[in-house]
Amino acid sequence: MASNEEILAGLAEIVNEETGLAPEAVELDKSFTDDLDIDSISMMTIVVNAEEKFGVRIPDEEVKNLKTVGDAVSYIASAQA
């Protein structure tokens, strides 16, 4: 099971690959849409890549609840437990 720091680093890498944003810009309190300017199509790609990287399943109905990077980190951590 990955630590929250490892999950954050992994998500930052995925966001960087999808959007070109610097990994250090991906912080727990950042909103995917408002702060990081990630649209719904990019978000789905990020979710699929996160599922593969962390070995978890994030149902479509849960994706809409992942407003911030911290929300995603918490969800992935609990899904791995």
Curated annotation (Swiss-Prot):
Mind telling me which Gene3D superfamilies this protein's record contains? ACP-like
Q: What InterPro entries does the record tag this protein with? A: ACP (IPR003231), ACP-like_sf (IPR036736), PP-bd_ACP (IPR009081)
Molecular function (Gene Ontology), one example: acyl binding
**Alphabetical UniProt keywords:** Cytoplasm, Fatty acid biosynthesis, Fatty acid metabolism, Lipid biosynthesis, Lipid metabolism, Phosphopantetheine, Phosphoprotein
Describe the location of the Carrier domain by residue ranges.
Answer: 2-80
Pathway connected to this protein:
Lipid metabolism; fatty acid biosynthesis
Q: Does the keyword Lipid metabolism apply?
A: yes
The entry's comment on post-translational modification says: 4'-phosphopantetheine is transferred from CoA to a specific serine of apo-ACP by AcpS. This modification is essential for activity because fatty acids are bound in thioester linkage to the sulfhydryl of the prosthetic group.
SUPFAM superfamilies the record matches: ACP-like
The cysteines covalently paired via disulfide bonds are none
GO CC terms, sorted: cytosol; membrane
- Cellular localization per UniProt: Cytoplasm
Biological process (GO) annotations held by this record are: lipid A biosynthetic process
Sites bearing O-(pantetheine 4'-phosphoryl)serine, chain numbering = S40
Q: Which family does it belong to?
A: Belongs to the acyl carrier protein (ACP) family.
Q: State its role.
A: Carrier of the growing fatty acid chain in fatty acid biosynthesis.
Q: Which HAMAP family match?
A: Acyl_carrier
Quote the protein name from its UniProt record: Acyl carrier protein
Q: Say which species the protein is native to.
A: Renibacterium salmoninarum (strain ATCC 33209 / DSM 20767 / JCM 11484 / NBRC 15589 / NCIMB 2235)
Q: What phylogenetic lineage does the species belong to?
A: Bacteria, Bacillati, Actinomycetota, Actinomycetes, Micrococcales
State the encoding gene: acpP
